[in-house]
Design a protein with these regions (language model features):
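Active-site and adjacent substrate-binding regions of carbohydrate-active enzymes
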Residues: 1-208
Length: 210
């Protein structure tokens, strides 16, 4: 299963190769800079000391996606351990920490959801509170942050996760893997399927549904 492969990779080299900056610097100088290109990096867990290497006036990229503030609902190593909804206090805390961390170095690309995540409307808003007012409030919280808001397709109309009746209806291999992990951990098929509904990246890849 994919989880075991990732674990082996992390044990081998931490999941990230050292010295990537040499390649990224050359990429910027030879490909981006000659065209004065605006670039967005998909970068995780960059600490304060590394920020100026990655973004800003002399960074590898113009900006990067703000992943840190949207990770707090992910608990444990299995999706069945994740929180059902994003805790608003934790999200507020992480947004403030991230904004202060950036300081005057640069701005980030603020996101609520992307192609690898469940729908933001489902993560951030309890089912009983879903509606025009709550979706509008969520949008306001995103666009009023310092930075550049990035909207993923379907987010502009408040799309939610998509229910599926069986694991065979999912295409994403990591979802199938997590389903089996949940089953092996003692979850029923219904509970494992509920985890898939709440967290599968297939939610972001589905067509508009009613």
């Amino acid at each position: 299963f994919l989880t075991n492969s990732i674990t082996r990779m992390q044990k081998r080299d931490g999941g990230t190769k050292n010295g990537i900056g040499v390649f990224l610097r050359e990429l910027k100088e030879r490909c981006f800079a000659p065209h004065d290109a605006f670039t967005v990096g998909e970068v995780f867990e960059v600490d304060r000391e590394q920020l100026e290497e990655f973004i800003g006036e002399d960074g590898y990229f113009s900006t990067m996606f703000a992943f840190d503030p949207i990770q707090s609902y992910k608990k444990g190593t299995c999706q069945c351990e994740f929180d059902r909804n994003m805790n608003p206090d934790e999200w507020k805390r992480d947004v403030f920490v991230n904004q202060k961390l950036l300081g005057d170095i640069a701005f980030e690309a603020n996101i609520i959801e992307n192609h690898d995540m469940a729908r933001g409307a489902t993560i951030y808003i309890p089912d009983e509170d879903y509606g025009f007012a709550s979706i509008s409030a969520l949008a306001g919280l995103q666009v009023l942050q310092r930075g550049m808001p990035f909207l993923y397709q379907g987010q502009e109309i408040g799309m939610t996760n998509c229910h599926r009746n069986d694991i065979s209806e999912y295409d994403d291999i990591s979802t199938k893997d997590q389903y089996q992990v949940a089953i092996d951990a003692g979850c029923t098929k219904e509970e494992a399927l509920a985890c898939c509904y709440e967290n599968s990246r297939d939610n972001a890849l589905s067509l508009i549904h009613i």
